[in-house]
A protein has these predicted regions:
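Structural signature of the thiamine diphosphate
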Residues: 1-3, 111-113, 119-134
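Active-site/ligand-binding-proximal alpha/beta "capping" segment
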Residues: 1-35, 95-109
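Glycine-rich beta-alpha junction loops
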Residues: 1-4, 35-39, 61-66, 92-93, ...
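Beta-strand segments within the central parallel beta-sheet cores of soluble alpha/beta enzyme folds
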Residues: 27-34, 55-63, 134-140
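Short glycine/serine/threonine-rich phosphate/pyrophosphate-binding segments
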Residues: 34-45, 114-122
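Active-site/ligand-binding loops adjacent to catalytic centers
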Residues: 46-113, 128, 149-150
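Phosphate-binding loop/pocket of nucleotide- and phosphate-handling active sites
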Residues: 78, 123-150
């Protein structure tokens, strides 16, 4: 676990997301992301906290103990403490795979299984809370790694 990972997302990724949202004149309602090493979600969380934003940080985790969503939910907290999440959204492996496949068909963008999980979790959050602002997630892996699964 590289602490510079957190710093990069706190000082580069999160400010860029925030700037893009400010330009739309909407609020940043939530950031939805799985945790591998935890650098992305922890860096974004720190930025949100430091800037007193009302943005909810939502952690995506596999629903099963023995899952196939590579890159997230391996049981180690690394750089992100799950207690810092406002909400935990559990996604089944088969649903993450289905979402990644359907996203590729709809957009032509081939993403991996953890990106499918992030997308589905963000959609479920929107359905559950109907936020007035923007819900952000990231597509953090490439689909060509999973061609045998697709």
């Amino acid at each position: 676990s590289n602490s510079y990972n957190v710093i990069c997302h706190q000082t580069k990724t999160a400010p860029e997301i925030h700037k893009q949202i400010i330009d739309t004149r909407y609020q940043w309602s939530a950031f939805v992301h799985g945790s591998g090493t935890g650098g992305t979600i922890e860096g974004v969380r720190r930025y949100i906290d430091a800037n007193n934003l009302r943005t909810k940080v939502c952690l995506v985790q596999p629903a099963e103990e023995n899952h196939g969503i590579q890159g997230i939910g391996d049981g180690k907290d690394f750089l992100f403490n799950p207690d810092n999440a406002h909400k935990i959204i559990q996604i089944k492996t088969e649903d993450a795979i289905f979402k990644a496949k359907s996203f590729a068909k709809e957009t032509g963008i081939l993403v991996g299984i953890s990106s499918g999980a992030n997308l589905l979790a963000a959609e479920r959050l929107v359905e559950a809370i109907s936020p007035s602002g923007i819900v952000v997630t990231m597509l953090c892996d490439r689909g060509e790694r999973y061609m045998s699964v697709y």
